[in-house]
Amino acid sequence: MEHARKTTYARRARRFPHGLVTMNHMEALHENLWPAPYAGKPLNATVVVPGSKSLSNRYLILAALGHRPVRLVGLLRSRDTELMMDALRALGVRCEIDEQVDTTVTVVPPSDGRFHGGTKVFCGLAGTVMRFVPGLAMFADGPVAFDGDEQAYARPMKPVLDGLEQLGACICLLYTSPSPR
C-alpha cells in the first residue's frame, strides 16, 4: 500500500529545475482521505476508555453534552479529571463514581438539558478544564466564574477567550495578573 501511494504521488508531483519534487497539498490530502464510518441508527455500545487525563477529560465533556447517562469505564483518576468532574458538577452534571471500581464513572447530564450558572469553576492547572469548560458555560442559564492555581494565570488563554467572544460570550476579567491574556 505504501509503495502504491509513493507511485501515485510521483505521477502527480511536479519537478522543478533544481530537482525539488512537490505536489499540490490538496492533492496529497485527497490521496489520504478515507470514508468516515456512519451509523444508520443510534449506537448502544460499551467503550473502554484508555488511561489518559487529556482523553478522559474529553470523554467527560462529550458525556456531559449528551441527553442520557453515559457510563465511562477505565477513566483515569487524576487531579485534572477530578477538577473536570468538579467543573461539570458545578454546571449541574452528575458524575457518579462507582463504589466498587473507581475508574468507572457515570455521567448524567442535567435533566432540564441546560447547564447551570450562578456558580464558580476552579480549573487548577488543568488545561482541558480551562479551555473546554468555558465553552460549555456559554450554554449555562446564568454567569459562571472561573479561577485556577496562581500559575494558571500565566497560561495563554487569549485565543480561547477571543474565540468565545466571537461566538457571543460576555467575558469579564476580574484579576490583576500582569499578563491576563
Regions of interest found by a model, annotated:
Residues P17-M23:
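Short, Lys/Arg-enriched N-terminal segments with co-localized hydrophobic residues
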Residues N24-R77, T106-A152, S177:
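Structural motif
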Residues P159-G163:
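Active-site-proximal loop->helix
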Residues G168-L173:
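A glycine-rich helix N-cap at a beta->alpha junction
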Residues Y175-R181:
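Conserved small/polar residues in nucleotide/adenosyl-binding loops
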